[in-house]
Amino acid sequence: MELEIVHLYHDLLNTYGDDGNVKILKMRAEKRGINVNVKKVSVGDSFKDADILFLGGGQDYEQTLAAEDMVKNRAELIKSYIEDGGVGLFICGGYQLMGGYFVDGAGKKVKGADVLPVHSEAGEGRFTGNIIVKNSLETLVGFENHFGRTYLDGGEALGEVLFGNGNNGKDKKEGVIYKNAIGTYMHGPLLSKNPALCDDLIRRAMIRKYGSCVLEPLSDNYDLLAKADMIKKLLKEDGAK
């Protein structure tokens, strides 16, 4: 059994170490005996398919470069992949890029890939800090750092914000889930702090490729204890305000 992870624009969109998510996916899959190949794809490169598609975050200029290449050369392929149940994880700038459009800090409206049912606009202040999100799978923790304000035009939110700002600081929603794709502002890296979410992505990819999947549990006891302690402290801090 094997999976191929395609890491899009790894050289342009990795300001916040989001490639750690690819490393975590690879590690947790390989611990179950699943061989993983990571293919890095940037401007001018090609790919035909993937089992998991990943895109991280970056600065406005690099994001615009990636957007121009994606809209011109890849948008239809990626859209077809997601509509067919392909698994994707898109973080921060990658989340914005996969939407219908985003407005950058200079007020320029940039066309997105129109893969996820969202749009984004630059805000007046930066949302920076820890974030806790209630999801049906697990309570997620991460770190947000974004000027963008994202609004859902369909799909469902990744979860409800319990601490932090999330998509736009107004509706208490964070991220989006559309079919087997997730868009989110959560760094961390996200999957290192939330192993159940990581395993869910692996499981979805395996089911799509092989028809079924049973993942043997891994020992995440220490990670989960640290996560629970963090959640407790942050919610206590929030309640004291």
Segments predicted by a language model, with ranges:
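A residue-level signal for conserved active-site and pocket-lining positions in enzyme catalytic cores
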Residues: I5, A113, N145
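Structural motif
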Residues: I52-G56, L89, G183-Y185
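A secondary-structure boundary/capping signal
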Residues: Y9, I91-G93, L116, H146, ...
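Amide-donor transfer/coupling interface in amidating biosynthetic enzymes
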Residues: A122-K241
